[in-house]
A protein has these predicted regions:
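Feature activates predominantly on carbohydrate-active enzymes
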Residues: 1-111, 116-118
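Active-site cleft segment of glycoside hydrolase catalytic domains centered on the general acid/base Glu
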Residues: 117-132
Length: 132
């Protein structure tokens, strides 16, 4: 069973040090999962097609290693629903962008991924996406 924390909230964001501390806490209390989905990471949601730069990759790698050291599964969650094109005219390009993003994270050591399609402003679009 999964026992852990989802960092996927609105409000005051966690610092990198806060994240490392939370991962240590997870290990201390035998939680086994940390889901990275911070709303303040624009490359998680608003600019999801963009790859992380070297400095951002270094921080993610540090989180991944901290999780491994604490027996905590690191799950990278991506939230592309605001502008992912689910229609024929844009689907292939967006699917390729999604795979490029996941491939770049896989190279960093991420082995568990989540695709978040919640918090969409248009409930009709959210229903259409979930039914695919």
């Amino acid at each position: 069973p999964y026992r852990g924390i989802v960092e996927g909230f609105y409000g005051t964001p966690w610092s990198h040090e806060d994240r490392l501390s939370m991962i240590g806490f997870c290990g201390d209390v035998r939680m086994n999962t940390y889901i990275y989905a911070p709303k303040d990471d624009s490359k998680h949601r608003d600019q999801w097609r963009e790859l992380y730069d070297d400095a951002e990759e270094a921080k993610l790698t540090e989180l991944i290693h901290a999780c491994a050291e604490n027996n905590v599964r690191f799950v990278y969650a991506l939230s592309p629903g605001l502008d992912f094109r689910f229609t024929a005219d844009g689907y292939e390009a967006d699917f390729e962008a999604l795979m490029a993003k996941y491939d770049s994270l896989y190279r960093l050591g991420v082995r568990d991924f989540a695709l978040l399609l919640d918090d969409l402003p248009d409930r009709t679009a959210q229903a259409a996406i979930k039914s695919r």
